[in-house]
A protein has these predicted regions:
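Active-site-adjacent structural elements in enzyme catalytic domains
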Residues: 132-134, 141-144, 149-155, 177-183, ...
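C-terminal accessory segments enriched in acidic
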Residues: 105, 113, 125-127, 164-166, ...
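Active-site/substrate-binding loop(s) of hydrolase catalytic cores
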Residues: 229-230, 237-239, 243-374, 378, ...
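Sec-dependent signal peptide cleavage junction
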Residues: 18-30
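Long, intrinsically disordered low-complexity tandem-repeat segments
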Residues: 31-74, 79-81, 85-86
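Beta-loop motif signature
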Residues: 31-33, 87-136, 140, 151-158
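Short glycine- and acidic-rich boundary segments immediately preceding or forming the N-terminal edge
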Residues: 157-200
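Structural recognition of the beta-strand scaffold that forms the well-ordered cores
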Residues: 193-196, 205-207, 217-221, 231, ...
Length: 451
């Protein structure tokens, strides 16, 4: 009995010793202690606890709290270093440059007129006026003068290509979007204006390429007849090409800039946007309900793809006063109806207003199709165009039929009509490359004649 009591007391003492050791370990900050033997419990705290409890707060907490603000501060400093917050110390009477240039990336500039910082964008052609001191150049944007660091200026065009020539139809909406993009990219040399509204309230655009104050002018029209809309795509591509190469490309030894600074192009790329829409999509795309319903009535079963007239069945190229209502159709329809009175249509009025405003020296009319050209007499112009296109000469004669050419002839304005592509219109899209290749230099060549 006594031996049994002694044994129980010994076990209790050992157990109390283990509990005391565990309690001591917990009070000294030990959290992870394996429940194995007394030796493991006493050895681990001495080797691991001081390192784990002291290193964690010293290495992680200060670094996390101090590093983040240092990084953001550096970025903020980098952003502001390229932005002149005050007028740079620059003498603006520097070396003349006077040509188009671009910036290598979006950068800040100082607007001298508004006395504030603004941004100039990559992919936009600016008129670089002067190279000044202290690493700055003076550029012009409209009537504004901006100081930009010279190191950011390049004279190689970095504008994105805009006109999509793979588009088989190339609609009025496509042209409208592209005109806006072109004017943004090349606003220093290209201006887009509106001469009026069509019957279905589409804008009648015309563009001025080159020096708007140039004394000589070449006027160009395309897509007077609805189904001839490929000429709009070709013309829009030519406009973009001339803008992209304005300060770098040459035609027969003369820079584009030299030619177009002295002889401007005024182009109406889609004279008949309602008609083009009808030819491409049918009357369903005409927004005005009365016009739409009337189109179905006057069509006479004709496939709308071959539509030539405007939205009320009047042929714009028969609506001029000279020879008005001579021949042609007697009722509204898809072609050759002159209307009730001359110059009755908004599209005709728009053309007349632009011609009277710009007073062109020469006019080029693009139609389709047949690869022929019409002109009143053999001239230096017609001979040059033949050498470039090899389109067959056709003398139009003295009889008038209310066409735009008749209107021009009556005012002694030299003109020539080029019929691109092969019949019938609308010309197949596979003909586009040949049309473009044959005619891409026509306008710059005509302009060069007037230097």
């Amino acid at each position: 009995m006594k031996k049994t009591l002694k044994t129980l007391m010994l076990i209790a003492i050992i157990a109390m010793g283990i509990n005391l050791t565990e309690a001591k370990a917990k009070t000294s900050g030990e959290i992870t202690v394996p429940e194995t033997t007394v030796q493991e419990a006493t050895t681990l705290p001495e080797t691991t606890t001081p390192q784990e409890t002291t290193v964690i707060p010293e290495t992680t907490t200060p670094q996390e709290t101090t590093t983040i603000p240092e990084t953001t501060t550096t970025k903020a400093e980098e952003t502001t270093t390229v932005q002149p917050t005050t007028k740079p110390d620059v003498d603006t009477t520097g070396k003349n440059v006077k040509k188009g240039g671009y910036v290598k990336k979006n950068v800040s500039a100082y607007n001298l007129k508004l006395e504030e910082v603004t941004e100039v964008e990559k992919g936009v052609c600016y008129y670089v006026y002067k190279e000044c001191n202290n690493g700055y150049s003076l550029i012009k944007v409209g009537n504004q003068e901006l100081l930009v660091e010279t190191k950011y200026i390049t004279y190689k065009c970095n504008a994105k290509k805009i006109v999509n020539t793979s588009d088989k139809k190339y609609s009025y909406s496509d042209m409208k979007v592209d005109l806006k993009k072109l004017e943004k990219a090349y606003g220093s040399i290209l201006k887009v204006d509106i001469a009026g509204k069509s019957l279905d309230k589409r804008n009648l655009y015309y563009v001025t390429l080159g020096n708007a104050k140039a004394k000589k002018t070449v006027y160009v029209e395309t897509s007077v007849h609805a189904r001839e809309y490929m000429n709009t795509k070709f013309m829009m591509k030519v406009i973009e090409d001339y803008c992209r190469g304005y300060d770098t490309k040459k035609y027969k030894g003369k820079k584009y800039s030299t030619i177009f600074n002295n002889v401007k192009l005024v182009i109406m790329p889609m004279v008949n946007p309602d008609g083009v829409t009808i030819s491409q999509y049918g009357p369903k795309k005409i927004r005005n309900a009365k016009l739409r319903e009337n189109l179905y009535k006057i069509a006479g079963g004709v496939d709308f793809k071959i539509w030539k007239a405007n939205a009320r069945g009047i042929d714009i190229n028969r609506n001029y006063a000279e020879g008005f209502d001579r021949g042609g159709a007697k009722i509204p329809g898809h072609k050759q109806y002159a209307g009730k009175t001359p110059i009755s249509e908004p599209e005709t009025k728009a053309q007349v207003s632009v011609v009277e405003k710009v007073k062109p020296d020469v006019v080029i009319c693009y139609h389709q199709a047949g690869e022929v050209m019409y002109h009143l007499n053999h001239t230096k112009l017609s001979n040059m165009l033949y050498s470039m296109t090899h389109y067959t000469h056709i003398i139009s004669g003295q009889t008038h039929y209310g066409t735009f050419s008749d209107y021009l002839d009556a005012r002694n304005i030299l003109n020539c009509t080029l019929e691109t592509g092969l019949t019938p219109a609308p010309v197949k899209n596979s003909m586009y490359k040949k049309i473009y290749k044959t005619n891409k230099d026509v306008l710059v060549a005509v302009a060069k004649m007037y230097l």
